[in-house]
């Protein structure tokens, strides 16, 4: 496959391999690059560089490849803890995942945990690669494993009966030892991924939202709020809401500027200043958001999925219990919240990932899948995601 320059003409999709340790995630990643990208050997992918996301160090390998229909950015993590951290911090956003399961072992504890995490962090779709099928001679056993995987997916509210399961061997693909379960299976897998994993909506097509980072008053002109537009478009003359911390208020954007130049609109990715009509300097603050009216609402209570840093990662040295009161850093500001642990969980140790209920002392513009950091006095001790809103 000739490598031309990166063509922006194809839709872009972020994807990743998930599944139990040693079931073949990295070998499969290498095999996909062999047929659809610039070949990366197992060792190149496995020696993933460390990166920091929200103050947390994560090892992640990034590869890219393309099918006829799409361009893919693919993440693969060497260790289980890296997956947990990656999915919770959203360091590697996943529009879909390839779940790798060894046919010889069937679903294992991390298989289950990664499916649960995918559900909690809102990975929209999963395609399954049943790996190492050459190690299983009995077709009935293969069927049984497939059934087990489908049941497990359904249990975590994925459409287990409809999810494509492709059977093959990543090793056979890498070694060219058996075309049918090697190359053919990898090509079939990517055809299923192309078909089954939906193309994500581009940020610019979503309703406007901008977290407010700073507030200025400009004499004779009014109040300007600055920030980076997270999604959507805002045009001069449009009505917006200011949401979070205080009661929601409405205003009109009377000007948009970027790099000191006046624009008629600001869009996803732009760092802008928005001039607001009839709002004084005291009427708005960092931590609120500017949003399309009715698109986002303020909440104080939610269920979270969180990863708590180990001591070595710079986190807490001791466990915490129900009624723990750290700060939750959403977008641009810290808000104190009270933690309630689920029944049967007495305490949370550094290094755990946990589902917990949180009640904030002031409301924040919130939606499912919003990420946050957990902090104590400005120091990050955990990362989390809003799994569901309770109130």
UniProtKB/Swiss-Prot annotation:
It catalyses: GTP + H2O = GDP + phosphate + H(+). The keyword Chaperone does not apply. Its EC number is 3.6.5.3. NCBIfam families: EF-Tu (TIGR00485), PRK00049.1 (NF000766), PRK12735.1 (NF009372), PRK12736.1 (NF009373), small_GTP (TIGR00231). Residues 131-134 are annotated as: G4. GTP hydrolase that promotes the GTP-dependent binding of aminoacyl-tRNA to the A-site of ribosomes during protein biosynthesis. Monomer. SUPFAM superfamilies: EF-Tu/eEF-1alpha/eIF2-gamma C-terminal domain, P-loop containing nucleoside triphosphate hydrolases, Translation proteins. It is an enzyme of class 3 (hydrolase). GO terms for cellular component: cytosol. It comes from the Bacteria. It is found in: Cytoplasm. Residues 10-201 form the tr-type G domain. Keywords: Cytoplasm, Elongation factor, GTP-binding, Hydrolase, Magnesium, Metal-binding, Nucleotide-binding, Protein biosynthesis. Disulfide bonds: none annotated. Residues 55-59 are annotated as: G2. Residues 76-79 are annotated as: G3. Mg(2+) binds at residue 26. Belongs to the TRAFAC class translation factor GTPase superfamily. Classic translation factor GTPase family. EF-Tu/EF-1A subfamily. PROSITE patterns: G_TR_1, G_TR_2. Residues 169-171 are annotated as: G5. This is Elongation factor Tu. Residues 19-26 are annotated as: G1. GO terms for molecular function: GTP binding; GTPase activity; guanosine tetraphosphate binding; translation elongation factor activity.
């Amino acid at each position: 496959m000739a490598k031309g320059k990166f063509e922006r003409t194809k839709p872009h999709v972020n994807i990743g391999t998930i599944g139990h340790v040693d079931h073949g995630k990295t070998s499969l990643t290498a095999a996909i690059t062999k047929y659809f990208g610039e070949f990366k050997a197992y060792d190149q992918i496995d020696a993933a560089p460390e990166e920091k996301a929200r103050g947390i160090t994560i090892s992640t390998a990034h590869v890219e490849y393309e099918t006829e229909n799409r361009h893919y950015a693919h993440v693969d993590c060497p260790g289980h803890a890296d997956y947990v951290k990656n999915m919770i911090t959203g360091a590697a956003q996943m529009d879909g995942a390839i779940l790798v399961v060894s046919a010889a072992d069937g679903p294992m504890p991390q298989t289950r945990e990664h499916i649960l995490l995918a559900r909690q962090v809102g990975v929209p779709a999963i395609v399954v690669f049943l790996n190492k099928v050459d190690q299983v001679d009995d077709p009935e056993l293969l069927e049984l494993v497939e059934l087990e995987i489908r049941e497990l997916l359904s249990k975590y509210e994925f459409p287990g009966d409809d999810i494509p399961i492709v059977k093959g061997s990543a090793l056979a693909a890498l070694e060219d030892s058996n075309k049918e379960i090697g190359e053919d299976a990898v090509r079939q897998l990517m055809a299923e991924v192309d078909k089954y994993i939906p193309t994500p909506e581009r940020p610019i097509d979503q309703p406007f939202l901008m977290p407010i980072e700073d507030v200025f008053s400009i004499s004779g002109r009014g109040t300007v709020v600055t920030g980076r537009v997270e999604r959507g478009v805002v045009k001069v003359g449009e009505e917006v809401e200011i949401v979070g911390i205080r009661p929601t208020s409405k205003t009109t954007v009377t000007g948009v500027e970027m790099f000191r130049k006046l624009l008629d609109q600001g869009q996803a990715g732009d760092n802008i200043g928005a001039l607001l009509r009839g709002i004084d300097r005291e009427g708005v603050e960092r931590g609120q958001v500017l949003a399309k009216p009715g698109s986002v609402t303020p909440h104080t209570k939610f269920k979270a999925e969180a990863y708590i840093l180990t001591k070595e990662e710079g986190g807490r040295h001791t466990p915490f219990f129900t009624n723990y009161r750290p700060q939750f850093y959403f977008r641009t500001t810290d808000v104190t919240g009270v933690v309630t642990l689920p029944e049967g969980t007495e305490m949370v140790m550094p290094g755990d990932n946990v589902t917990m209920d949180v009640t904030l002392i002031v409301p924040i513009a919130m939606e499912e899948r919003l990420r946050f950091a957990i902090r104590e006095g400005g120091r990050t001790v955990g990362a989390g995601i809003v799994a569901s809103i309770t109130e």
